[in-house]
């Protein structure tokens, strides 16, 4: 079945284009977003007033998430879903940046920032299947040519640290946890929308500082810790979401009315929530398929056992924790000593 994996990835990408964007457009989602932007046309960021088109475009990006992350949303199910959504998705930038650091020059996998920005523009449901397609194609070509995976560069702590700062902090601020007000929340959402750039800039700064000080962690540093950490975050959020209930509360008409009217925001929130739910399912279907491919290709777990474990893990631990566990197993395997031919020594399963 491994040879069918690229075709499945392409099918998932097409399903995302139809199921995510097609449904949203059919239900009038863009009209709802225009209504929110019309009520709050500026991000309030100094300097952007001189570029009204750019300011309005950025506000359009903010308006997409604002109805479901507002401090007092009229659709509480949206806020709860977004909390666990962002917590589970945190493992994906760790994978993108780790594999980007490991990839050969010229490999499409190497451009982790580009993949991240593409995810924010086209949704992760479109990006992840395409990423999986190229990952499988290039890893298959490397295996055919007898090549080996490059080791991770020194200072492996840069990836988890940059993801924590560039992804985690903007994601937290987008929910306005300190009740700083709508204007600052809009900037937090905008920072999260551009999180791939935040991660990239943070990583570059950390590497420069580390290089100047001449400090680096030893090669024996266990890089699986990153996956364990984001896996625990994803599992806790998944269990919390299940514990708080999967159904939303009745609509209340006294929230985020400063952005738009209750009716408009209520309908917009429901459309965005449906959009995100479809996006969530396809995103992790693609990433867990990639995890299955890697576990099976390297013969770490039997094909049927890997599929069953990943499916059960999604249900009980959450997709983020399951994906993190699978990638941690792969990372642990890759860190084992290599033989004369470059093959990693392991006992057959």
Curated annotation (Swiss-Prot):
Gene Ontology, cellular component aspect: membrane
UniProt keywords, alphabetically: Glycoprotein, Isomerase, Membrane, Transmembrane, Transmembrane helix
Pathway the protein takes part in: Antifungal biosynthesis
GO MF annotation: an example: isomerase activity
EC top class, as a word: isomerase
Disulfide partners: none
Glycosylation sites per record: 222
Presence of the UniProt keyword rRNA processing in the record: no
Subcellular localization(s) per the UniProt record: Membrane
Function: Cyclase; part of the gene cluster that mediates the biosynthesis of the tetrahydropyranyl antifungal agent restricticin that acts as an inhibitor of CYP51 and blocks the ergosterol biosynthesis. The highly reducing polyketide synthase rstn3, the short chain dehydrogenase rstn4, the cyclase rstn5, the FAD-dependent monooxygenase rstn6 and the enoylreductase rstn7 are required to generate the first stable intermediate desmethylrestrictinol.
Protein name: Terpene cyclase rstn5
Organism of this sequence: Aspergillus nomiae NRRL (strain ATCC 15546 / NRRL 13137 / CBS 260.88 / M93)
UniProt gene name: rstn5
